[in-house]
């Protein structure tokens, strides 16, 4: 009789240990958020289609504040700037003479500062710079005149719609 009880208690303890382990694993699956390695928590696209250097400066400040917040809080992010029309002024050092986007005095005075801040965001914070190729080709700007960090996209407005609709990006335009 004693041997029978001992066998039953050992089976009971084994089942209880296995059951407890199973229960813990099930709870962890429910409680711990499932984040895939390739999943980005924050996706934001900025629309730059304006010519005002002060407005561009404000946008760069906004982006810098955003990426620093994400980095300080260990939040994976994908931040992009899509440049369309007048925005082309900010991704080249070409004066764009004879085009509707020609450099003016305010841009000349701020270009070095704006370039440095933009390229720092691209190189140090992985902010992606995307330029509408329709804009570039319509003014005859050679690709080698663009900052090397700039990626050409077929259409800026199509890209903005795609990022928002298909990829879940938040849209920001600095006014």
What are the language-model segments listed below?
Residues 3-21:
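Bacterial N-terminal signal peptides that target proteins for export
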Residues 4-6, 32, 76:
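General helical secondary-structure elements
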Residues 10-12, 29-34:
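Detector for intrinsically disordered, low-structure N-terminal pre-sequences
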